[in-house]
Amino acid sequence: MDVFMKGLSMAKEGVVAAAEKTKQGVTEAAEKTKEGVLYVGSKTKEGVVQGVASVAEKTKEQASHLGGAVFSGAGNIAAATGLVKKEEFPTDLKPEEVAQEAAEEPLIEPLMEPEGESYEDSPQEEYQEYEPEAKGP
């Protein structure tokens, strides 16, 4: 009986040791996983922020170029239609600078719909939900 008890005791110690090693391994794995997830998350966030900044800068550049072209085109149209004499059109203005200023200035007046109502004040119409008609067999 003594041998049997000693064998069970040794088995118990082995199970406890294995459980302790497993617990330690799981804890280490969890920490490494957490570190990995945080690293990937921080790199993803950096990439998104950098991407958004890049897109915003490119959009600003394109708006500036487009604004310059519109400004030049408007001047040519005004001169061609006789609204403004070509000599009266300011030559010292650089379309890129005017477009840059226009892109940076906020809208002073709210956008208006053709009927004169602002988009912000549009009435909320109530709607009624209809049940679909049952189709016959």
Curated annotation (Swiss-Prot):
Compositionally biased residues, Acidic residues: 98-131
GO biological process, one term: negative regulation of neuron apoptotic process
Membrane-crossing segments per the record: none
Domain of life the protein comes from: Eukaryota
Compartments, record wording: Cytoplasm
Molecular function (Gene Ontology), one example: calcium ion binding
Basic and acidic residues compositional bias, start-end: 88-97
PTM sites of type Phosphoserine: S118
A GO cellular component annotation in the UniProt record: cytoplasm
Region called Disordered, residue ranges: 88-137
Gene3D superfamilies linked: Helix hairpin bin
Keyword RNA-binding: no
Principal location: cytoplasm
Key word DNA damage present: no
Expressing tissues: Expressed specifically in brain.
Region (4 X 11 AA tandem repeats of [EGS]-K-T-K-[EQ]-[GQ]-V-X(4)): 20-67
Post-translational modification: Phosphorylated. Phosphorylation by G-protein coupled receptor kinases (GRK) is more efficient than phosphorylation by CK1, CK2 and CaM-kinase II.
Sequence repeats: 20-30, 31-41, 42-56, 57-67
InterPro entries from the UniProt entry: Synuclein, Synuclein_beta
Database matches in PANTHER family: BETA-SYNUCLEIN, SYNUCLEIN
Family: Belongs to the synuclein family.
Job of this protein: May be involved in neuronal plasticity.
Annotated protein name in UniProt: Beta-synuclein
Annotated source species: Rattus norvegicus (Rat)
Lineage per the UniProt record: Eukaryota, Metazoa, Chordata, Craniata, Vertebrata
Gene designation: Sncb
